[in-house]
Structures are given as C-alpha cells and as structure tokens.
Amino acid sequence: HHVNRCAAITEGSNGFPGAAGRLPAECATIGQVLQDNGYSTYWIGKNHNVPEEDISAGGNRSEWPLSKGFDRFYGFLGGETNNWYPDLVEDNRFIEPPSTPDEGYHLSKDLADQALRMLRDQHSATPSKPWFMWFCPGANHAPHHAPQEYIDKYKGKFDDGYEAYREWVLARMIERGIMPEGTELTPLNPMPEDMANKDDYVRPWAELNADERKLFARMAEVFAGFSEYTDVQVGRIIDYLEQTGQLENTLVFYCADNGASGEGSPNGSVNENKFFNGYPDELSENMQYLDTLGSAETYNHYPTGWAVAFSTFDSMLPRPLTDS
C-alpha cells in the first residue's frame, strides 16, 4: 500500500508519500498489465480509487479507470452509492440511470446488464481475443436496497438473533470441514475493555426489547434479500458464459474487500449518513421505517450485532476510526 501511495482510502488521503492517493507510474494496475498483453479489459461497478477532488464532470481523469488500463467502465466512483438512484459513470462521463425504480431499476441489475452488453460485443467482434472483467457490484455494501419480493423471502429467518446465527454458522463450518472440531466463537465484543468504546458494544439479543428485535431482524432480512438479488445478477453473467461456450475457459474469482461492516452502529440505521455525521439513531424514529427498509425511502444499514454474526468466524470488524 505504501509503495503505491494508497495506504488509505481516497477520502483519507493526506498528501504524504505513502497516502497520496495517486498511483505512481511505476505501479501498474492489473488492467494495464493485461491490456499490454492483448486483453480486452472491463471494469463494472464500484471504483473507490479516484481522489475526491477528481470526482466531478470537470475533474482530472488521470486516476479514472480508462486511464488505468481499462477499455470500458460502467459504475460509480467512491465507496458506495444509492442502489435505486446511483451516481453513474460510463467511461469518462457522468450519466443518468437508464430507468427509474418504478420502471424496475436497481443498480445490481443494471451493472449485470452492462457487463453482458460488453461481453456480447466482445464475443461478436473479437471472439478469439482474451478478456478480463472486474465486476464490483455495490452489494453487499450499504445502503442495503433490494426488491421487496427478495426481502420478503427471508421474513422470520433471523428472529432468533445474531448470537443464534453465529452458533448456526459455526456448526455448519465445522460440519463441512472449514473449521476444525473444538473451534469456539470469539466474544460478541472482542475489544479489550481499556481500548473499547462502551457505546459501540453489541447488546445481547436477550437484552433487546420487542421493537428492537423486530427492527434488527428486519434489517437482516433486507440484507439477505440484497445478497440474493445480487447473486442472481452474477448468475446471469455466469449463465451467459456457459451458453456461449466460454465458461470452461474462464477463471472466476470471488473476492471480498473487508467483510461485514460495523458502520451501522449497535442500533442499526435507516440512514447510514447519520453515522458519518454523528447524528444519533433513535429507535422510535427508525421504527417508522420498518416496512420500507430497503426501499428508495431509506439508506439503511444493519446493527453491529449482525456484522459480528455475518463475519463469523472473524473477530473484528471494519469501521472508520474517529478521535472520540
């Protein structure tokens, strides 16, 4: 990270050599390496590599994907975007989404549509040319947005709480040989007491009141629906490769950047931007959005307890550090 001057995310770049946020010429991207070796290169979805000051219609394009070894780009610049109304970029220009949520729009589907369009163009024009596609959907990063029918499929699935879910996941890991017999779960709050912020502590499920359990379980249902909906879109790409006889000659890597996020705070949020602005989430206020979680009316994120559960068997969570 320090050699490529990207020791922090672009929003945290400070100008010092190790964290300047701009790749030096001697550090090539995988796109540049493959492009130089005769590949077509495509980047779809999230690009969190462009400095903030360059993310504008008149901004410098030197750190944008087309300047970093990619023939085509379709997605968004930054850490996250609204899945119903995303800030879209095509190649080197900002664009409006091709349709609205009322017309069936969702970012995950749009990204898969564009990926398929590029792959079809490639297969039609230069079928013998190798290609590389970096497909990075906004999922499962917050905000957690999904079509209602996918959310409803998980109704009641998380009512037992995050501790019970952790136990279930660990048992399946041991059963499948992923973890050895005798493996024990990490503490629900793994930070040493002298380092922990008590306001960040995950409360045991048994200590939550009825409304909290209802809200927290619904947030997990939304996340699960979001996950499955995105899997379906990835599956469309895999299906196309199989239908065109390319799958057996394609390497598919599933990668994750940092696992489940703790940015939802112990109480979850109907608007994740509250966390970034230090605005507290009130249960009574959030309960008003119970039935609209995951829709265009919310910018929701699950509570930290689910981040702990969904990160089983990891002990720690990614979360921005503050001075407080």
Residue ranges of predicted features:
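Formylglycine-dependent sulfatase
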Residues: 1-324
